[in-house]
Amino acid sequence: AASTLLGLSALPTDHPQNVGMLGMHGNYGPNIKNQECDLLVAVGMRFDDRVTGNPAHFGANAKVIHLEIDPAEIGKIIPADVAVVGDVKRSLPLITERIRKRDHSQWIAGFRACDQIEYEAVIRKAVHPAEGRIRMGEAVAAVARAYRNDAVLVTDVGQQQMNAARYFGFRRTRSVVTSGGLGTMGFGLPAAIGAKLGAPDRE
């Protein structure tokens, strides 16, 4: 499963079927394999331009099943072959219980090959630079490790938001508070206060 910015902690970062973040600031694998997939199941997804780029080329070979609570989002950007309007907590199990299990190990292996390409080309320099100043990605990854990928991530908007999205790890759901959509600058501090009040037992 790939995620978008607002769904980052839906699966733990190290889950074997978590293939990274989709979109212009996302990972190589989801963006490449999106062009190869024959079925795209979009759960609570708006298909905004930061994810799709040119909608005409997004998942061009795929049938689309779109699950969304807001009917206005269905077919707004990407046409849905199957539209499911409602709370995904109820509607998603109705779909998954009808799916026949198959071996997708080769498909997942394709993502892992992309991971290796991206690591060598981009991530190694961002997170483990050989020399020079501390990089933003390096700092984000160090903080994530210090909190054992178990902290609630709150970001403001800008380059640090994207670095945090790429290099912060998650073990639990509901671990990201960030401003998508309008991307409101100045969001970080009041959101962090709210996150601590809402989850006082978490860092």
Regions found by a protein language model. Give the residues of each.
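Active-site diphosphate/adenylate-binding microenvironment
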Residues: 7, 115-199
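Glycine-rich, acidic loop regions that bind phosphate or pyrophosphate groups
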Residues: 8-112
